[in-house]
Structures are given as C-alpha cells and as structure tokens.
Amino acid sequence: LRELMDGFMVPTKEQRQSLYKLCGIDYRKYSRSVDGIQLLVSDFNKVRSEEDFLFIEVKTTNAKNVKKLPYGAFFGFTQNEEDLFKSKDNYRLCIVHTGLKEYYSMGYEEYLSLIQNKRVQYQINLRSEQLDVEDLPEL
C-alpha cells in the first residue's frame, strides 16, 4: 500500500498515541484497530487536527473472483474496528487486492451500502496448559 497510496505510513507507537489523543480515542481499547494512516499534509509533524490525516484499516485479498474492487471482497472485522469506523469521520476501510496491485478506500456510509451479508464470529483462545484435576470446574 505504501507504493500505491500517496501519504500512507505506519505510525510508530508514539505517533499512534498522539493521533489517538488528538482524536479523543482510548488508546488502550483501540490500539490495534488501525493499521496505518494517510497523511493529508506533507509531513507527520504538520498534523494539527483530524482533517490532516485519515486512519486506514487494511484488509487484503487475492481472490480470483474479485475482478473490480470492492465488489466481491470478503474479510474479517473486529467489533472495535467497526465501532471506531462508525464513530470517526477520518477512518477509512481500505481493501487491497495483492494480485491486481490495486486498492479501494471507503468511508462508513459506503461500507454499509456495500454489505451483502454480515455475521458474528467468536474468536476463542484456549488455556495454554492443563489444569490439575482439583482445579477443574464441577459439572
């Protein structure tokens, strides 16, 4: 995406924290809800307001059935990503087709208009070690 999108960059942790503070976003809750930014000014140090940049959430595909972006794209989206997308005018969803070497960037309203279907999926992390028998819950 760096080669395709003018002004795209992946901010450092400190840069990300300063942007979140500027926009009134809880960094601890949403720290992983943005992949990069697109600068609308010439340099990161010139960012003064939300109008100076866009938050970019990147979703990639190499699907053969996707001939023209964004049509036919399939991706996962966390609740936090979608909540931030809905609440921030300077948040963009960017779908990158790695085979076509193209991207499509959209705002929340366009995203809503393009959804064909949407379902909730839970992500489960199991314990990393076995519990002793006396620590197991009673059934």
Spans of features found by a protein language model:
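Conserved catalytic cores of phosphodiester-cleaving nucleases, focusing on short active-site segments
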Residues: 27, 36, 52-64
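Short, flexible loop/turn elements at secondary-structure junctions
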Residues: 29-31, 60-62, 81, 97
